[in-house]
């Protein structure tokens, strides 16, 4: 059995977060990945993430891992299989085989988050960034 580490990115607008929602795997990034792995290996394969995200949150470089139940695919094979079946709003940036003890959640060393806020009455509305910002209609209390 191989332990695969993948770095992924996604546009979270259509998802209720990374973690699978019971009975509704299409609404979570984890659910999408696990559905593809289930198809790939003909058995359920769990995807573990370094962190969970909330609804609508995007990821630029999120680390996940899974244990392949058989040695059918190498890194290129895994990458190509995901490329074939992933929706346009999720991409695989890299795939590598790691030590069997690697666990993306328990071995995470750091997390970073970027919050982008647009003040509603600012001089110009963001055009290209409009799906990556939160619109704020009230005064932001930075001290709080």
Q: Can you annotate each of these PLM segments?
A:
Residues 1-144:
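Structured-RNA-binding interfaces characteristic of tRNA pseudouridine synthases
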């Amino acid at each position: 059995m191989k332990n695969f580490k993948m770095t992924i990115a996604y546009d979270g607008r259509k998802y209720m977060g990374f973690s699978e929602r019971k009975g509704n795997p299409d609404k979570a990034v984890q659910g999408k990945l696990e559905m593809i792995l289930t198809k790939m290996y003909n058995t359920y394969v769990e995807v573990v993430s370094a962190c969970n995200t909330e609804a609508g949150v995007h990821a630029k470089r999120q680390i996940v891992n899974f244990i392949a139940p058989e040695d059918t695919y190498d890194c290129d094979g895994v990458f190509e299989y995901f490329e074939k079946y992933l929706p346009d709003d999720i991409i695989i940036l890299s795939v590598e085989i790691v030590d069997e003890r690697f666990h993306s959640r328990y071995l995470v060393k750091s997390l970073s988050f970027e919050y982008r806020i647009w003040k509603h009455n600012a001089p110009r509305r963001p055009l290209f960034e409009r799906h990556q910002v939160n619109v704020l209609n009230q005064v932001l209390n930075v001290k709080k």
